[in-house]
Amino acid sequence: MIKLRLKRFGKKKEASFRIVACNSTSRRDGRPLQELGFYNPRTKETRLDTEALRTRLTQGAQPTNVVRTLLEKGGLLEKTERPSIAIGKARLEKEKLAKAKTKDGDNDSSKAESESNEAET
């Protein structure tokens, strides 16, 4: 399977990346089949070879998550909501609701205790 991934190059602590098409079993910095673009995370500079990327995508190449994000920003792919992000947001909302319920439950139980203490006296 052909993957679209980032190939690291540059100095230590000053990494830049090339967007490349390579076999999924090859090394990260191994010899690619084709270089398709460039990405510098420090300056946010991105250069994409749109024709070559479209060709590779129509041939069935699978982009990694980071490359998919870069292609979405470049307008080559439609933005899609990733399930892992949606699940994380849903989990956070459930936790917030659970915390709110426990706080309300604690307040109700303390009121009930104070009422029972008043009833005894």
From Swiss-Prot:
Transmembrane segments: none
The keyword tRNA-binding appears for this protein: no
Record bears the keyword Ion transport: no
Coiled coil (UniProt feature): none
Compositional bias of kind Basic and acidic residues: 97-114
Stretch list, region Disordered: 97-121
Any one Gene Ontology molecular-function term assigned to this protein's record: structural constituent of ribosome
Xref: InterPro entries: Ribosomal_bS16, Ribosomal_bS16_CS, Ribosomal_bS16_dom_sf
Superkingdom of the source species: Bacteria
One biological process term in Gene Ontology: translation
Name of one Pfam family that matches: Ribosomal_S16
Alphabetical UniProt keywords: Ribonucleoprotein, Ribosomal protein
GO terms for cellular component: cytoplasm; small ribosomal subunit
Annotated family: Belongs to the bacterial ribosomal protein bS16 family.
PANTHER family in the record: 30S RIBOSOMAL PROTEIN S16 (PTHR12919), SMALL RIBOSOMAL SUBUNIT PROTEIN BS16M (PTHR12919:SF20)
NCBIfam families xrefs: S16
Stated name of the protein: Small ribosomal subunit protein bS16
Organism: Prochlorococcus marinus (strain MIT 9301)
GN (gene name): rpsP
